[in-house]
């Protein structure tokens, strides 16, 4: 099979409320799949169900084609960062990670090597022997995320991994996640659509306990009739630019200019006409297609 995780028609009820109401999703192996949805949509419940912390009322789960989570089968191959995960206050960073690695089935030597590599990757070397209680919220979050990658598991699920991180450490974590692309299947739940768009190869829109739409990021955001130009300085207006580019409608939102055009024009042709005129304002990025936010807010999942 080409799927790392498959869930079919999962239902989880709490009294009359269905936290999962037919949640069906196949996560491709080697993908970074993002879950997008409102609070209470079912993202966290689905993750906890896949991880074996929550028992569904009905439906099927299979991880790596080996059925639902079983520690004897999946230890060392599957891991999770739960939302708002707590770490023992008196545990020391390196010792804690080594211990978690041992629980994943690693030898003492392998657990120590993996812990040391992750401590360095997450910029925690100067805190390796510090107790958790002495760490800031952001540092605790980095330790919690690091434990999910101990021993190079095949599947990692991350629930809000970037929340609570400062911009520098958030960027470091994004780079780390991207470095695992293809060799590790990663599922990320986040309310920050920019993060999902920067990280993910696939995206699932979740609402009312089910998946409304699952596509590649490219399929969700591709649109040959639109290009977004992010500029260092906002132009005083777009009328002159528009006059110089027949067939192109320009919309300005602060320092971003959107070009909208028909099928008779290509992205390359529009770039050739506009970019020379935008250079004086400093072009920071050129993004063909619509944003993930546009795709999500314009879809059924806004219900």
Q: Can you annotate each of these PLM segments?
A:
Residues 59-74:
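Conserved ABC transporter NBD signature motif
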Residues 264-303:
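C-terminal coupling/interaction segments
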Residues 51:
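Helix-to-loop junction immediately C-terminal to a conserved catalytic motif
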Residues 98, 102, 110-127:
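Conserved ABC ATPase "signature" region
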Residues 156-160:
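Catalytic Walker B motif of ABC-type/P-loop ATPase nucleotide-binding domains
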Residues 172-262:
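ABC transporter nucleotide-binding domain
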């Amino acid at each position: 099979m080409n799927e790392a995780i498959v869930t079919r028609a999962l239902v989880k009820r709490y009294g009359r409320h269905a936290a999962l109401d037919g949640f069906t999703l196949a996560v491709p192996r080697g993908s970074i799949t993002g879950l997008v949805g409102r609070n209470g949509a079912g993202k966290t419940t689905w993750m906890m169900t896949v991880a074996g912390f929550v028992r569904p009322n009905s439906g099927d789960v299979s991880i790596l084609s080996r059925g639902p989570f079983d520690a004897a089968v999946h230890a060392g191959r599957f891991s999770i960062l739960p939302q708002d995960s707590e770490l023992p206050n008196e545990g020391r960073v390196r010792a804690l990670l080594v211990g978690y690695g041992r629980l994943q089935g690693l030898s003492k030597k392998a657990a120590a090597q993996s812990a040391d590599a992750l401590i360095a990757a997450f910029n925690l070397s100067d805190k390796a022997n510090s107790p958790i209680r002495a760490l800031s919220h952001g540092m605790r979050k980095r330790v919690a995320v690091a434990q999910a990658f101990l021993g190079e598991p095949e599947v990692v699920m991350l629930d809000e991994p970037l929340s609570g991180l400062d911009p520098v450490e958030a960027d470091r974590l994004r780079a780390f996640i991207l470095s695992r692309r293809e060799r590790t299947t990663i599922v990320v739940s986040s309310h920050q659509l920019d993060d999902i768009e920067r990280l993910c190869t696939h995206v699932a829109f979740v609402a009312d306990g089910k998946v409304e739409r699952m596509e590649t990021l490219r399929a969700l955001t591709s649109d040959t009739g639109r290009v977004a130009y992010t500029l260092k300085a906002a132009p005083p207006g777009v009328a002159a630019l528009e006059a110089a580019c027949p067939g192109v409608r320009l919309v300005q939102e602060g320092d971003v200019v959107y070009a909208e055009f028909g099928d008779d024009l290509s992205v390359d042709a529009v770039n050739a006409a506009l970019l020379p005129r935008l250079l004086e304002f400093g072009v920071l990025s050129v993004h063909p297609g619509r944003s993930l936010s546009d795709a999500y807010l314009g879809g059924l999942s806004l219900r």
